[in-house]
A protein has these predicted regions:
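Polysaccharide-binding surfaces and accessory modules of carbohydrate-active proteins
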Residues: 9, 29-55, 63, 69-79, ...
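Beta-strand-rich recognition/accessory modules
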Residues: 4-5, 167-277, 300-301
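Short, hydrophobic/aromatic-enriched beta-strand segments in well-ordered soluble domains
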Residues: 72-76, 91-95, 107-109, 225, ...
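Aromatic- and carboxylate-enriched substrate-binding clefts and catalytic-loop regions
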Residues: 319-544, 549, 573
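A structural motif
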Residues: 315, 440-442, 559
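Active-site-proximal substrate-binding groove within the catalytic cores of carbohydrate-active enzymes
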Residues: 15, 237-242, 430-433, 468-644, ...
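Conserved, mostly hydrophobic/aromatic
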Residues: 8, 107, 236, 310, ...
């Protein structure tokens, strides 16, 4: 066996490249039976996703470059059914010994077959046991949104069995697309006092899948951690995949955050320069002037009154949707002031009145949807939209209904999604930016372009050419152009967080797990890795039972409040209970404003927490003082020791402890 070592972790492979082994010094970690370290999936347009496993290859051999670098060569690839593909592949594996040692892996693909190589899962960590023989103690830290925690993934992933539509008899998969579900391109597992990390280590930005899997029902235990790259390599094409990194270190998820964050800062991440007024944003009311179904919720003249109602809750920002004539979620991408709502001058006057009260206003446009019932689609949009693997347009169907039941059941609106890097689309977004700022808005907000719908685009006429997964680079190009055009002192916002896009926006309207609360949400994964960004929470729509939990969750992590009464149909004045809850937390945050608004989210102070008590932490601008934020999600009060402080927190309440 040929063995590479990186810290405690070892990877071994036989000369013929059929057998591999994972091990770790002093730990029970070992590979599963007939383990793979990569899998590929071929496609001849008739047979889809023909699996190719590393353990079944017959044309492989290992070349030892030096003690830290091997190349695994395959002259041909062989499918599960014995079909041979005239596809050569060369997998580079390098042991990287640094602060966090690990293995860097990537592949060179040279395809001469009629079948296309759609997907390559590399690296693949295919285990029978990790670092604890009690498998149920393992915890997966997934990049689900801003991050979440999955206890006992060996059992939990079984719940992803599709029962019908997928080949669960071969593997049960839990898939997280990047971007969209994933805000960052890494994840890992806490196991036996160590953190097993897998992440991208490359400057390229492509659609990617981060995946965990377990064995089919009735089979021996197996847990797989991998990432799928999507080369879509056709016959006659040669390409190199992105580099990825595997590492095992003593400690917890913070080692993964360090590995990814350190690489990003050294290679592609520059923190955005955010205006102070954005940092000082307490939250906003998000309202819709003209609804999806044509009703008028607010005229332009109503906007100052709506803002004043938000002020009573401590909110200092108004996010305005549906301000154009065509109706919200209709007519995209055409935006014109609505004369019935007050016309261009009325909109400009309303914004000025809010600003005179000390408020800020953002105007919405959608960054990627094209309404197929428009002249724009018929004349241009059909050329700019993303195309699927069969040559069809991706379609998105909205079912926003009014008081009836038919539209909410059957829908009425269809969209295609723009391939964001097409020059005409970028030019159009710049026109929209100029339009929004022409009314005096403080911010131009672009919905969805931050991550939504990361579908590969198979239109080779677009700038990504014959690399469908590289359509994601178009998002970066588009937002980079928008950001560069933004006047000084104003701001660009978008919906959903993706790490590579953070340098080109000033705030994120949260729409993933993290800003959206659920029991296992753990947004500290993103917030610690890239702490500079301003984020809002999501789904505070009314004073429903449990809304206090959403607000307390947002509070401890520093999310600004996104309050959208009745989903933008009214203002907060109709909800005095919600007004009081928001105001209470805004006032508490104000007592520690230097931490919340101008500090840095960190995770340095370990505190022993009772069950259902959650924690955040902020470092003051002086780099010394710390604020510990706590939320007691129990039905009874709890007492917690934080450093030398003892704090008692009432049931369902949030509290702060300042450490000097």
């Amino acid at each position: 066996m040929n063995t590479l070592r990186a810290g405690k972790l070892q990877f071994s492979i036989s000369d013929d490249a059929k057998e591999i082994a994972w091990s770790a010094d002093g730990l029970p970690l070992r590979e599963s039976r007939s383990a793979d370290f990569w899998r590929a999936y071929m496609d001849d347009n008739y047979r889809r996703e023909m699996r190719v496993r590393s353990c079944l290859q017959t044309y492989g051999h290992v070349e030892v470059i030096d003690a830290d670098h091997i190349v695994v060569h395959y002259d041909k690839l062989v499918g599960d059914d014995g079909r041979e593909f005239d596809t050569a592949m060369h997998v580079h594996i390098t042991a990287n010994v640094s602060t966090y040692p690990g293995f860097e892996m990537y592949a060179e693909i040279d395809n001469h077959d009629d079948a296309r190589l759609n997907e390559l899962q590399l690296p693949m960590i295919d285990l029978d046991t990790a670092c604890d023989t009690a498998r149920e103690k393992d915890v997966m830290y997934r990049m689900n949104g801003y991050g979440d925690i999955q206890p006992n993934p060996w059992a939990a992933i079984k719940n992803n069995h599709t029962e019908y539509i997928s080949a669960d008899d071969k593997q049960i998969w839990c898939v997280m697309p990047y971007p969209a579900n994933c805000s960052m391109a890494w994840f890992g597992m806490q196991t036996g006092g160590h953190f097993l990390y897998l992440g991208k280590q490359d400057t390229r930005y492509e659609t990617q899948l981060f995946t965990t899997g377990v064995s089919p029902r009735g089979c021996d235990p197996q847990l797989v951690m991998t990432t799928s790259q999507l080369p879509y390599a056709k016959g006659g094409e040669t390409l190199t995949t992105m580099r990825c990194f595997v590492s095992l270190n003593e400690g917890d998820w913070r080692t993964g955050s360090d590995i990814y964050g350190n690489y990003a800062r050294a290679n592609w991440y520059t923190p955005p320069t955010i205006p102070d007024w954005v940092k000082d944003m307490t939250g906003w009311q998000r309202i819709i002037c003209r609804s999806q179904y044509g009703d008028v919720n607010f005229t332009y003249a109503d906007l100052p009154r709506a803002y004043r109602e938000g002020q009573k809750a401590g909110l200092n920002f108004l996010m305005v949707f549906g301000w154009w004539r065509g109706r919200f979620d209709n007519g995209y991408p055409v935006y014109e002031p609505d004369d019935e709502l007050g016309g261009a001058d009325g909109l400009r006057a309303a914004i000025k009145e809010i600003q005179d009260m000390g408020g800020r206003v953002a105007l919405y446009t959608n960054g990627q949807l094209i309404d197929v019932a428009t002249d724009f689609y018929r004349e241009k949009g059909h050329r700019l939209c993303r195309i699927d693997i069969d040559g069809n347009e991706y379609r998105d169907h909205y079912r926003f209904g009014n008081a009836g039941t038919s539209i909410r059941t059957f829908g009425y609106k269809s969209f295609v999604t723009a391939c964001a890097g097409t020059p005409e689309w970028i030019d159009l977004q710049l026109e929209h930016e100029d339009l929004k700022f022409s009314f005096g808005a403080d911010s131009a907000f672009y919905d969805q372009i931050g991550a939504f719908a990361p579908m590969p685009c198979f239109c080779e006429d677009h700038p990504h050419g014959n690399r469908p997964a590289q359509q994601e680079e178009g998002r970066r190009s588009c937002l980079k152009a928008i950001h560069a055009r933004c006047p000084e002192g104003r701001a660009i916002g978008t919906e959903m967080a993706t790490d590579v896009l953070l340098p080109y926006v000033h705030y994120i309207h949260g729409a993933q797990i993290g800003p959206i609360f659920y029991e296992n949400a753990f947004p500290a994964m993103l917030l610690r890795t890239f702490p500079e960004m301003v984020h809002t929470d999501r789904f505070v729509h009314d004073d429903k039972p449990g809304v206090e939990r959403l607000l307390n969750h947002a509070f401890i992590y520093g999310f600004r409040f996104d309050v959208s009464p009745w989903r933008g149909r009214t203002d907060i004045s109709s909800m005095p209970l919600l007004t009081g809850l928001v105001k209470k937390l805004v006032d508490l945050r104000e007592q520690y404003r230097e931490f919340f608004y101008h500090g840095t989210f960190v995770c340095d102070t370990d505190v022993e927490l009772p069950a259902k008590v959650r924690k955040g932490e902020f470092l003051a601008p002086d780099g010394v003082r710390r604020l510990i934020t706590l939320w007691n999600d129990n039905p009874t009060e709890v007492t917690i020791c934080v450093g030398e402080e003892s704090v008692t927190i009432a049931a369902g309440e949030a509290a702060c402890v300042c450490l000097n």
